[in-house]
A protein has these predicted regions:
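Active-site-proximal mixed secondary-structure blocks
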Residues: 1-43, 51-165
Length: 165
């Protein structure tokens, strides 16, 4: 068994250390977070940090990285207070991963990736039609995590769409 102490961990190259630490919590689900800005332009971004926080009320959160660059997903959620979470499946994982590329604020990731937006009346953010399990949330709280300048974005589930399979 390999043993790695904190000094060894800190002396790893940044990229390798990131890969090691990211893998420690095991398998992570891949999810696409759908948002719209005030002009109605859809945004889509992949996240692996989605976590269940409670059932009553039904709360789910995700971690967003520090604001060292423009974060369209976070900006849109702050503006509209709504977002969707769409589980990625084997039918579109490559297109989902493409959402991690850098796009300008006016560019729609749905168009860039070939994924299909699903808009439902009363929900102010797009779903991903290809996703088998998707749900809408309204923003409840954004919690700053001072240790690494990330944010925990917490939403309450308002709608769930699930394939019958």
């Amino acid at each position: 068994m390999k043993y790695i102490n904190q000094d060894e961990l800190l002396n790893m190259t940044t990229r390798y250390r990131t890969q090691v630490v990211n893998s420690l919590s095991g398998f992570k689900s891949a999810n696409l977070i759908g948002t719209s800005n005030k002009e109605g332009i859809h945004n889509l971004a992949i996240f692996s940090s989605v976590v269940h926080l409670g059932a009553s009320p039904a709360l789910v959160g995700f971690i967003t990285r520090p604001n060292t660059v423009v974060r369209h997903t976070l900006e849109n959620i702050q503006q509209t207070k709504q977002f969707t979470i769409n589980q990625v499946n084997d039918g579109f994982w490559q297109a989902a991963h493409q959402t991690s590329a850098r796009y300008e604020a006016g560019e729609c990731e749905f168009k860039q990736t070939g994924l299909t937006p699903l808009v439902i009346e009363g929900v102010g953010a797009p779903f991903v039609r290809e996703s088998r399990l998707k749900y809408a949330l309204k923003l409840k709280e954004i919690v700053p995590i001072q240790l690494n300048d990330t944010l925990l974005v917490i939403g309450e589930i308002t709608n769930i769409l699930c394939d019958k399979e």
